[in-house]
């Protein structure tokens, strides 16, 4: 039952992007269609992830941010199969085992759109780089294994919290 609900939500949300991509590919070519639809999909991804990744105001501590993001990720647990991998005062690491949106894009035959659906967290991380750091080494949209999100305080000394991890080398197109 839960998998059916995830399937319906993912396919309903991604159908307009897939249809637009196929229609624009005929009219403008695949590259231009990918750029236009990808930008729109990234913007929607940022809006939807904005409900999960909380704002961190200047007077907030990282521990307040961390407790809110854990609460927010937990509320989406049924949709995404989210697990808290580890946490400390300086970081929170999540593992997302299921993404109905990238699954739908692959089912529709448009896996090239997956990276745009997965770009929202990196865009939000870039906007907040003066407040916290972000790292992700796996993504459902690229390697399909899982999605591992790690949010670090600026004071964190862990090796994975390098600012350069915000950029994904496979992203060559502008959003």
Listing of model-derived features with the role each one plays in the protein:
Residues 1-91, 100-117, 131-147, 153-175:
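N-terminal accessory segment detector
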Residues 128:
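Conserved catalytic core of Hanks-type protein kinase domains
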Residues 94:
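A helicase ATPase "motif cassette" and its flanking acidic/Ser/Thr-rich regulatory loops
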């Amino acid at each position: 039952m839960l998998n059916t609900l995830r399937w319906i939500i993912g396919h309903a949300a991604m159908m307009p992007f897939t249809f637009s991509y196929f229609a624009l590919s005929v009219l403008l070519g695949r590259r231009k269609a990918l750029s236009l639809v990808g930008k729109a999909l990234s913007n929607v991804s940022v809006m939807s992830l904005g409900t999960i990744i909380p704002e961190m105001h200047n007077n907030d501590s990282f521990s307040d941010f961390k407790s809110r993001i854990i609460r927010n990720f937990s509320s989406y647990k049924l949709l995404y199969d989210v697990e808290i991998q580890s946490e400390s005062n300086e970081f929170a690491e999540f593992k997302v085992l299921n993404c109905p949106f990238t699954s739908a894009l692959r089912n529709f035959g448009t896996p090239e759109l997956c990276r745009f659906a997965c770009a929202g967290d990196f865009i939000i991380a870039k906007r907040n780089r003066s407040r916290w750091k972000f790292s992700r080494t796996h993504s459902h949209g690229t390697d399909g294994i899982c999605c591992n999100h790690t949010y670090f305080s600026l004071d964190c000394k862990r090796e994975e919290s390098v600012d350069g991890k915000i950029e994904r080398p496979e992203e060559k197109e502008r959003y």
